Amino acid sequence: MFDLQLLNKVNEVEKQTGQSLPSLLSKVPLGNVLAAFKELQVADLVEMVSSVSISKLTHGLTIITPDEISQISPEKLKIVLKHGNMLTVERLQSKFGSRSIILAINKLSENELRSLLAEDNFDVMSDVIENLAFASSRGI
C-alpha cells in the first residue's frame, strides 16, 4: 500500500511540521491519502499541514476526491483547503460531480477562487460551477 517514497514523504512532512500524521491519516480514506501524497510535493503538503487546522484538513482530505487531487493544481487545492468552508464544498460536491468542479476550479484564477471561497455563498458558487462546466461542455 504505502511504498517507500510515500513513507519518506510522510516522514518529511512530520519532521518539517512537527505534526504527527498517523492520527490524521487514519481518519481519511486511504485512496485520498495515497492520491495526496503521490500528487503533491513535500513543500505543498507541509504548507497544507502548517496553514490549515488538523480538523479542517482531515475534513477536506476526506471529501476532496482522488480525481480532484490529481487534476487540480496544488496551489488551487491549498486555496480550497485554506479558504473554503468544507461544509459548503461538501454541498457543492453533492450537487455537482467531480468533473464539473474540476473544470470550474481550473478555469478560475487563483484570486477568483479565493474570493469565491471567502464569500462562501452556495448559490453564487453553484452558478459559477454551472456556467463554467456548461460552457466547457459546449466547447466555449
Q: What do these predicted regions represent?
A:
Residues 1-140:
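General marker for long, soluble alpha-helical cores
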